[in-house]
Regions:
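Periplasmic-binding protein-like
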Residues: 6-8, 98-127, 148-155
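N-terminal hydrophobic or amphipathic helices and topogenic motifs
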Residues: 22-25, 132-182
Length: 182
């Protein structure tokens, strides 16, 4: 895998965070109006995982079934007063003049076959990801950081739980009888 970026996901709230929300439990406790991301999005999967870790039922969030198609749309819903809070990325919150409560750091990587690492296109991409201009661009985005940008990383380092499937050996029929009926 090739390092790409780290980003922060968290709570998008009104400027000044008037409800004092710091966690998913706070949203449930206060009855704050929540705006969700659609089923199947990475943010929704993350939210459901965080709810499970906190021991909260999804229905504890008022508005859990309401969703917007993007982080920008979540921020717009909060800015317009249609929701008190939503899960999203910091850059979307800051673009609308909203506050942001960080919850999770996510690491992003690019995957390719090991044999592709020596290909000119892959080398060019890796070089681009390590240029000062690209690194500065990543640093300028609120909530993003160029973590290991362009570096080749071992899968076992990035995903310690991952195990490669071993190739199954072909069954040898030597010294075995095979009877076919037609």
């Amino acid at each position: 895998v090739i390092g790409f970026a780290q980003r922060t996901q968290g709570l998008i709230v009104a400027s000044g965070n008037p409800l004092g929300l710091q966690s998913l439990a706070d949203i449930a406790r206060t009855g704050a109006r929540f705006m969700n991301r659609p089923l199947g999005t990475g943010t929704r999967v993350l939210l459901d995982d965080l709810l499970a870790q906190a021991g909260l039922d999804a229905q504890a969030l008022q508005g859990y079934t309401l969703n917007e198609p993007s982080h920008t749309a979540i921020a717009q819903a909060v800015a317009a007063g249609a929701a008190d809070v939503g899960m999203g990325i910091e850059v979307a919150a800051r673009a609308r003049g909203l506050d942001f409560v960080p919850l999770v750091q996510e690491r992003y990587h690019l995957a390719c076959l090991k044999a592709s690492l020596d290909q000119p296109a892959t080398q060019a991409l890796r070089s681009l990801l390590q240029t000062p201009d690209w690194l500065a661009h990543m640093q300028a985005l609120h909530g993003y950081a160029p973590l290991h940008c362009g570096e080749v990383l071992a899968m076992s380092t990035v995903l310690p739980w991952w195990q490669f499937a071993r190739k199954k050996h072909a069954t040898s029929f030597r010294n075995k009888s095979l009877l076919l009926h037609f």
